[in-house]
Amino acid sequence: MTQPAILVLEDGTVFEGESVGANGLSVGEVVFNTAMTGYQEVLTDPSYARQMVTLTYPHIGNTGFNDQDDEAKQVWAAGLIVRDVPRRPSSWRNQVALPAWLQTRGVVAISGIDTRKLTRLLREKGAQNGALMAGEIDVEKALEAARKFPGLKGMDLAKVVSTETTYQWQEGQLDLNANAFVQAELKFKVVAYDYGVKINILRMLAERGCDVTVVPARTPVAEVLAMQPDGVFLSNGPGDPEPCDYAISAIQELIAKKVPTFGICLGHQLLALAAGAKTVKMATGHHGANHPVQDLDGGRVMITSQNHGFAVDETTLPANVRVTHRSLFDGTNQGIALTDAPAFSFQGHPEASPGPRDVGPLFDRFVASMAEAKS
């Protein structure tokens, strides 16, 4: 027997549907993602902490879930909003259906609502705070919870989702034919600051010969330098980058020491802040796997995976920082490089998961910068 569910936005808009997850109440910022596939990766991406994800593609759950496609050890999204869930998933890799997977992990989710209407509302009004409620329904309680949510501006979530202990990562990409993970020869020592790192980012680094040491977000830079890394990686993550003063000061020290540094997503924003720029909260953010980005150095246009609600303000970039990539959707900054240090970053997700890997060569660029520094 299905349970009722509602989504209530802070402006008072109510969507009624049915529960396809756990019963309960969950609050967060409601955003929309335009990817047609990769819902498992989206739900387990730490960058979605405190966000409820609306998937615009109407049929979600077609291929079920498996043990190999998680991007973290737990679900970080605050909730899931979909139009329709197929009754029977179909994939040779499927191990469990969407409702059972969500219920086991305690994720509140709603289906049967007009996601096109919701997406238009979010596009026109911007991301909204909201509340998902399933099981026993109380609209007023849900509305009150939505309006009490403080929003992501000023919220440091990197320290919330980060690992609590240091660990090693040496596992490469999954070879589906062999049903095994690639093991490469490890030539470079990389320290990865975990602000909410995705597993497939670590796999992309390991596949290129990086022996990765993952450290908590607030690890003192002196400890990182004592490891004598060939390079430092600044990971993706959720929330507002500006409150992460511990990360900004650490990155400033890495820049001063000329340590090869590569940042993705939140790591990109933190590198910009460390260089002296500012960031801004976006109205709707970028969430999807079809975003065109131009490489300003070569003019090439690439289709990228994106997941961020904050952006670097290009007008505040200092003279020693050049713009390398720009969004062709809205002109926002997508990449920077320092002219006086071996440090660069990209706003989107070169590892995709889900999405295209047009920007994957940025990992090769990082490896090349470490090789040059060692020579």
Swiss-Prot record:
User: SUPFAM superfamilies, alphabetically?
Assistant: Carbamoyl phosphate synthetase, small subunit N-terminal domain, Class I glutamine amidotransferase-like
Q: Which GO terms describe its cellular component?
A: carbamoyl-phosphate synthase complex; cytoplasm
**What's an example Gene Ontology biological process for this entry?**
glutamine metabolic process
Q: In which pathway does it act?
A: Amino-acid biosynthesis; L-arginine biosynthesis; carbamoyl phosphate from bicarbonate: step 1/1; Pyrimidine metabolism; UMP biosynthesis via de novo pathway; (S)-dihydroorotate from bicarbonate: step 1/3
Q: Which UniProt keywords apply?
A: Amino-acid biosynthesis, Arginine biosynthesis, ATP-binding, Glutamine amidotransferase, Ligase, Nucleotide-binding, Pyrimidine biosynthesis
EC numbers listed for it are 6.3.5.5
What is the active site of this protein? Answer: 265, 349, 351
Q: What is this protein called?
A: Carbamoyl phosphate synthase small chain
> What is the native source organism of this protein?
Xanthomonas campestris pv. campestris (strain ATCC 33913 / DSM 3586 / NCPPB 528 / LMG 568 / P 25)
Name of the gene this protein is made from: carA
